[in-house]
Regions:
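Proline-centered loop/turn at the N-terminus of a beta-strand
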Residues: 10, 120-121, 164
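A short helix->loop->beta-strand "cap" motif at the edges of active sites that frequently abuts
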Residues: 34, 117-121
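Catalytic His-Asp segment of secreted/periplasmic serine-dependent ester chemistry enzymes
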Residues: 127-208
Length: 208
């Protein structure tokens, strides 16, 4: 697919350990022809501020970007669910946001980055289904939220800002029956899992 719009372009990825591991980026790069890929993922960290892993919170990592990218992917949510970070509510564009909620941190980050880099093609990915440490697609966390609630929040945010959303929660094929085939521990993808993510992501990115 060397004649697509991303040939020679730059791509930054923000997220947690699934991003930090660098498993999907080289596969997507080979497929789409990105010339530069920078990985800002931080293992174990949520989007939301206020956890004991605050220094790596995606909301802060994203703000540290010091250059414009042609494409920017935000892939977060599973640690917010696991660490019982408050979901919050979607607020109008331009509001004062609470970085200690998932919605607030996500909206705050998006607004800061879009203000700085309005031409960047930002895209949001929902968290994958999981089944680890007693946290799966059916369990409510200590805040009363399902993982699907965080995935739905990402979709709502994407719609509010007219940003494309890749709903990996719904279309990746990761579920309780397949997690042993796609992950090492029913959370973190193995080689086959990253291949599946990359295939899905490449088609998505090629279309935006």
């Amino acid at each position: 697919m060397g004649n697509n719009r991303w040939q020679g372009a730059s791509w930054a990825t923000l997220g947690d350990s699934i991003t930090a591991a660098g498993g999907y980026q080289p596969l997507v790069q080979a497929e789409l022809g990105f010339a530069k890929v920078d990985n800002f993922g931080r293992g174990g960290c949520p989007m939301t501020a206020g956890s004991d892993r605050d220094d790596g919170a995606t909301v802060y990592m994203g703000r540290s970007l010091e250059q414009a990218y042609d494409c920017l992917t935000i892939f977060a949510g599973t640690n917010d669910y696991r660490l019982n970070m408050p979901l919050g509510v979607l607020r109008p564009i331009g509001s004062a946001f609470d970085n200690h909620t998932f919605f607030g941190a996500y909206q705050s980050l998006i607004e800061e980055l879009l203000t700085r880099y309005p031409l960047c093609r930002m895209n949001l990915w929902t968290p994958l289904q999981r089944d680890k440490d007693g946290y799966d697609s059916e369990k409510r966390n200590d805040k009363g939220c399902l993982l699907a609630d965080y995935a739905a929040a990402v979709q709502s945010i994407g719609q509010a800002y007219a940003l494309p959303v890749l709903d990996l929660y719904a279309v990746s094929g990761f579920n309780k029956l397949t997690l042993d085939s796609f992950t090492n521990d029913r959370l973190h993808p193995n080689q086959e899992g990253y291949r599946r993510i990359a295939q899905t992501a490449a088609s998505f990115l090629a279309a935006i």
